[in-house]
Amino acid sequence: MVKTNVTIMRGGTSKGVFFHESAMPNNKNEWEPFLLDVMGSPDKRQIDGLGGGNSLTSKVAIIKKAYTSDIDVHYTFGQVSISEEKVDFKGNCGNISAAVGPFAIEEGLVKAKEPMTAVRILNTNTNKMIIAEVEVEDGQVKYDGDVTISGVPGSGSPIYLNFHDAAGSVTGHLLPTGNSSEFLDTSQGQIEVSIIDYANPLVFVEASSIGLDGTELAEEFTDLQLAQFEELRSIAAEKCGFASRFSATKLSPAVPKLAIVAKPEKYKDSTGAWHSSVEMDLHIRMMSMQKPHQALAVTGAICTTRALSVEGAIPARIAKNHSTKVRLAHSSGIIETMVEPTGIKIVRTARRIMDGTVYTHGDYQMM
């Protein structure tokens, strides 16, 4: 057994366990078993660890101060599988990224500057830069505010995330297969997809091509449909070179992510609120770790926004408009992104929930 310091933070619509890299095992080969131990995986309830039994709450962030002039902190993201002995380090989580800036400031890794502190974050999973703009008041991170985001109760201070030059985040190419769209052979026949890698790799499929209307809520998908979605995602994973289609669920469960898109249409979200078609530019339903995402991943929103400018890509063909402000409708509501000369920006909120000590079952050589 070992014990080490942890912080639990909410970032956007996700919640994760934050570690200083100095609080991790010295041997990086032990990171995966250590994190599985901490989170209580594999177990669908994660009853014996810090995980919440949901892909949105089974996440970790490992932070280290940078000592170069153009980067403030290094940030490594891990998606901890609930049911498998696997931690996927391939991609990033944009929602968890929203909490990295506040964490870095409060831990003294970045000097607080009022009224806004810009934190330059290098995501080591993708080797891409994220600039987080965090409000500061009286030398402290400001959490209270009026910003609301779909999928999170209450309101908070805005945190602006700007994803810089995020093309080819995992595969090295905006179009991993070289095609803006292509047909994949599945057990259900040929299905057209667009595979695009920006902030994270996504596989886009039009809802109507798989028998959906695109307004379905996360809880409405059947087990059979989820299996069909995973088959499609696994074939795309093979196309990206991550794993064979037969082993992708085990070896590359987090990326690419499947995104089902549809033209704007009136719908009722999971809170019971109605949204008219004029409030949105595109419907999107994303899968995360073989389950429906309850909202929309930030990296999914960023990738979708970039996809709107890719000629021939499915999202670009069916979106309502291609302006600098993009409105994406998901199960929990609507998320907005902003296209700027320096990248794609999105606003999130975050909150520090607790600090404490976690105890493991196993013994690890700590730093």
Swiss-Prot record:
Recorded GO MF terms: isomerase activity
EC number per UniProt: 5.-.-.-
Presence of keyword GTP-binding: no
InterPro entries xref list: PrpF-like (IPR007400)
Keywords: Isomerase
Pfam family of the protein (one): PrpF
Family: Belongs to the PrpF family.
Name by which UniProt lists this protein: Putative isomerase YraM
Gene source species: Bacillus subtilis (strain 168)
Source lineage: Bacteria, Bacillati, Bacillota, Bacilli, Bacillales
